[in-house]
Amino acid sequence: MELVIGLLVILLALFAAGYFFRKKIYTEIDRLESWKIEILNRSIVEEMSKIKHLKMTGETEEFFERWREEWDEIVTAHLPKVEELLYDAEENADKYRFKKANQVLVHIDDLLTAAESNIEGILREISDLVTSEEKSRGEIEQVRERYSKARKNLLAYSHLYGELYNSLETDLDEIWSGIKEFEEETESGNYIKARKVLLEQDRRLDQLQTYIDDVPKLLADCKQTVPNQIAKLKDGYREMTEKGYKLEHIQIEKELDTLTNQVKRAENALLEELDVDEASAILQLIDETIQSMYEQLEGEVEAGQSVLSKMPELIIAYEKLEEEKDRTKTETELVKESYQLTAGEIGRQHAFEKQLETIGRLLEQAREKLDGEHVAYSLLIEEVEAIEKQLEEAQKEHAEYRENLQALRKEELQARETLMHLRKTISDTARMLQKSNVPGIPEQVKDKLETANHHIEETVSQLEELPLNMEEAAKHLDEAEKVVEEVSEEAEDLVIQVKLIERIIQYGNRFRSQNHILSEQLKEAERLFYAYSYNEAYEMAADAVEKAAPGAVKKIKADQSAS
């Protein structure tokens, strides 16, 4: 029983597979059949009828015959063959010869693809032929008009073209021959070939029109404009040389000879080769070179004006600075009698004198070159501007040095004024301590007071010396200011602290009779207080009172700050 069921299952599976493959093949057969019918229904004959208005000779006749033969072959040979193969594929599918059926279908697809490609090629060639005829029919009149216009212009302005007239006329004759060739090919039915001939004449007319438009100007440039520019530049060069300008470094005469040869090259490119682009490029380069030469000459003139105006000014400024140097040197010697100058200040004076010597030497060299015959202004201006910069730096350095000399007296007066202020601060601090009834001054404060007085006395001593060493005096003065500021602040803090200790002890006295421990602590605080150990006295008193009345110390501080 199980064997029977197994066989039935296998049979059903085989039947299902066979059904699936047959259906797939039938679907492909239907697709190929539809494609075949679509090809058969293509309007090739209708498309071919579009050329009936053309002359059926030459290329057109050859094309038409070939297209008709190819279409007949598709209809009478390829498509019947496809029909036969479709029947074979269907028969193979019915007999479950699926592999054979698929091979036949692939072959059919190849045949239909080839037929489709062949048809597309025919349609494309038909379109090209018809389009060529239509475009040429529309463009030939434009070409004739352009030809006529070019010939009229050439005849009307023949005198502008000189030796090129015959060459340009020959080109026009060749274009006319090309137009005639176009007409002959069109009459012979060779529309595609005629199209190529027409496009070539159109291109040649474009080129010829460029020649007609550009050649007169280029010839005028070669024969008149550029030679005149070269002559004018040569005259300007000669005139500047006669006025004393040194222009050997520019080498204009040699360059102008080269430009003259370049003009001949441009003219030859036009007359012998009819190469407008080459001639234009050469003339453009010549124009750029001429402009560059003018810029160099103008630069030489500007440099000359600048040199001739700056040199007298620099000489005057140098001589004035020399006079100031002598006065400053005398002033420096006078200052040295009263003040000790630092090594840096003395070095600045020596450096300034050397710098001035260098500037004088450079000025003399520049003056010699200016009086000579072989140095161009454009080269000399760089040296003059460098001297000008050095002179400005020397003037600035000298002014700063003079200011430093004058500042020494100001620094001395400022130092003496500061000393008076420091002495007053110390005196005020001592008076404040005395009025505050402080039991005594701690050793730390005494030491700082002594240190401050020491630096003050050292500063006074330095200020009394001749020559005065202001740098050393300033060091002692800075130390004195620092120490006086510290001791003044500490003295103020000391007075505040003493008053606070007294208030805390007074506040704690109310608890003495009731609290023996507090009484002993306050007694110790008083001992420390009169021993000038104010920090320890504060800690002892504050600790005792805070234990007896928490928060009392904070309140006492607040009351003291408010009073």
Swiss-Prot record:
Keywords: Cell cycle, Cell division, Cell membrane, Coiled coil, Membrane, Septation, Transmembrane, Transmembrane helix. GO terms for biological process: division septum assembly; septin ring assembly. Its main location: membrane. Residues 133-159, 243-276, 309-529 form a coiled coil. The keyword Transmembrane helix applies. It is a single-pass membrane protein. The chain crosses the membrane at residues 3-21. Residues 22-563 are cytoplasmic. It is found in: Cell membrane. Residues 1-2 are extracellular. GO terms for cellular component: plasma membrane; septin ring. InterPro entries: EzrA. Belongs to the EzrA family. Negative regulator of FtsZ ring formation; modulates the frequency and position of FtsZ ring formation. Inhibits FtsZ ring formation at polar sites. Interacts either with FtsZ or with one of its binding partners to promote depolymerization. This is Septation ring formation regulator EzrA.
